[in-house]
């Protein structure tokens, strides 16, 4: 089936993309305003876009003609923390997606404890198995409703039980039990069903695959 995006309204194009670009990791962003009040919100338009320097991007929309709390906080303080979401915290994460009035502390409302970060002033969610301390590089505004937050990761926290070899940065990803976003509304997936494939160099590929062509 062919879809011409130019003929679709914004809701239809959103549904089409979020139902097909899956699974998407979830950035559970903790930020703070200029008075130190905390905000927590999940975003699934998120991924890492470089390892050196380590860069992540988060897509944040606007609300009511202005920036969402997360975007306003990030632009004001130029720092935030991305927490990744395990299945055990899925319900709490979903609660923080509620459209609370401005100034409400979602962490306090949901009873989520925090721990201090090392390099940024914004705390991390204590129960999250992975937290990325981030500093803002730039915000790219696209049209009137889309913003891409580009940030550098300055520190990473990983739950001890998921670290196989700290010196080599080997992580047992399965032990993180992370979830991902699927289609809207309300679609999620677990990361338990995984498989591995070793990447071949050209000589190996030629020997095992090329001769069959």
Each language-model region and where it sits:
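Basic, polyanion-binding surface patches
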Residues: 1-213
């Amino acid at each position: 089936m062919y879809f011409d995006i130019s003929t679709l309204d914004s809701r239809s194009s959103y549904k089409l993309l979020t139902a097909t670009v899956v699974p998407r990791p979830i950035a559970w962003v903790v930020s703070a305003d200029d008075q130190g009040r905390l905000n927590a919100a999940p975003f699934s338009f998120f991924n890492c876009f470089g390892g050196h320097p380590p860069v992540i991007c988060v897509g944040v929309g606007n609300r009511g003609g202005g920036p969402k709390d997360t975007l306003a906080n990030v632009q004001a303080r130029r720092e935030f923390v991305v927490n990744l979401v395990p299945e055990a915290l899925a319900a709490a994460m979903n609660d923080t997606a509620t459209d609370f009035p401005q100034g409400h502390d979602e962490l306090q409302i949901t009873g989520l404890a925090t721990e201090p970060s090392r390099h940024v002033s914004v705390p991390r969610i204590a129960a999250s198995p992975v937290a990325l301390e981030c500093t803002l590089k730039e915000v790219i505004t696209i049209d009137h409703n889309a913003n891409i937050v580009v940030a550098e990761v300055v520190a990473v926290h990983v739950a001890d039980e998921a670290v196989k070899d700290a010196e080599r940065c080997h992580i047992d990803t399965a032990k993180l039990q992370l979830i991902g976003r699927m289609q809207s509304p309300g679609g999620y997936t677990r990361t338990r069903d995984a498989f591995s494939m070793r990447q071949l160099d050209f000589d190996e590929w030629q020997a095992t695959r090329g001769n069959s062509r």
